[in-house]
């Protein structure tokens, strides 16, 4: 899913949440909840891969020390999380950056409805398409 284009992810969620889709009875399409689902689908693989890489590196570094102290996997996890807290914070910031820069999936499932589902990135896209570049630039800053 990490390489899935955002518009395709939005289309898949659209198909799931549309009235004829399996989750259509919940009426989530064109709501902020649908936008959150789209964002979660896009950033979850990135968060998982980066977190795994960070913690796997620590695991390899601390494995012998933890075993010599008699720590099993469940006792090692808090140590790894504590020592990897800055790496995990960086992972969360990377996920936030990815989510906040997203336009495609959010526009497909949210609809860019003024006052309801319009967010900064979709507003920038709208103003750019209308030719109001000064406003689009101002929104970006």
Name each model-derived stretch:
Residues 1-56, 80-103, 127, 136-141:
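Membrane-water interface segments at the C-terminal ends of transmembrane alpha-helices
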Residues 25-28, 72-76, 80, 112, ...:
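Juxtamembrane loop-helix boundary motifs flanking transmembrane segments in multi-pass membrane proteins
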Residues 109-141:
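Interhelical loop and adjacent transmembrane-helix boundary motif
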